A protein has these predicted regions:
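Catalytic cores and adjacent flexible loops of soluble metabolic enzymes
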Residues: 1-254
Length: 254
């Protein structure tokens, strides 16, 4: 079951009021119970704030979570999963952390945290890091950060964390993802060609952190453009002819 804290966004995005969302919950949980469901899932929309109503505090979040948990308890089912749907990108790492800690303290049976946080203000990869540190296991991302929300007032600027950036972060933290980062970067380049404009990822432009044989040559010339920066994948030909920063090339060997 799902409820938006922001009634204004519920009306704009779902064409339903918050009250209508709540009123539909009883039928949903009853149908799940009749079908033999053994565990329930809840989704909290606009958890951290709204472009139309301002910020929402922790108590407001917990009140709405309690309402949904109780709906499941009314039919004898515990909740083991919660999803945060932050289409307007109000998340920040400290609010994610305080919310997850409060939920774990109050409802320890909720074990799975799903994060659908838009990257409107550029803080979402930090929010995802905070969630990773607390054991969240489900994260929504997109190639190059593509996405947006026409109902929140930010359009395409309300995109997502770029998949390639998040996978790079996970790999740096020693978390196996099953993704080939090099292929993700190539896919992000293809996506840019398809949509016809640059996307919002960083690792697809600067490359992963170079190690071992991939470290840059010390006599590399100036690298200015994004095209030239793609040498990590396309080789040194992309920056041939650029100026050298070394006035005395013997300094390279000193």
């Amino acid at each position: 079951i799902h409820v938006e804290i922001c009634d204004s966004f519920a009306r704009r995005n779902y064409n339903r009021s918050q009250a209508q969302q709540i009123a539909s919950m009883d039928a949903s949980v009853r149908a799940a119970a009749d079908a033999g469901a053994e565990a329930g899932s809840i989704t909290l929309g606009s958890p951290f704030g709204s472009n139309f109503e301002g910020p929402f505090d922790l108590n407001r979040r917990l009140e709405m979570i309690e309402l949904m948990v109780n709906k499941w308890h009314d039919v004898g089912i515990d909740v083991n999963r919660i999803s945060f749907s932050d289409a307007m990108g109000w998340n920040a790492p400290h609010t994610v952390k305080e919310t997850m800690l409060a939920i774990r303290d109050r409802w320890p049976e909720i074990e799975t945290f799903h994060m659908h946080l838009h990257n409107s203000r550029g803080a979402t990869i930090a929010s995802y890091y905070a969630a990773l540190e607390l054991g969240a296991t489900e994260f929504d991302t997109s190639l190059g950060g593509m996405g947006g929300c026409p109902y929140c007032g930010n359009g395409r600027s309300a995109g997502h964390v770029p998949t390639e950036d998040f996978v790079d972060l996970c790999h740096e933290m020693g978390i196996e993802t099953g993704y080939d980062l090099d292929k993700l970067i190539q896919a992000a380049w293809i996506a840019e060609e398809v949509v016809g404009h640059p996307l919002y990822g960083h690792v697809s432009k600067a490359g992963p952190r170079p190690r071992a044989d991939a470290v840059y040559p010390i006599d590399m010339p100036f690298v200015e453009s994004l095209h030239e920066a793609s040498h990590f994948a396309n080789g040194p030909s992309v920056y041939e002819g650029q100026l050298s920063p070394w006035g005395d090339r013997s300094a390279l060997n000193s």
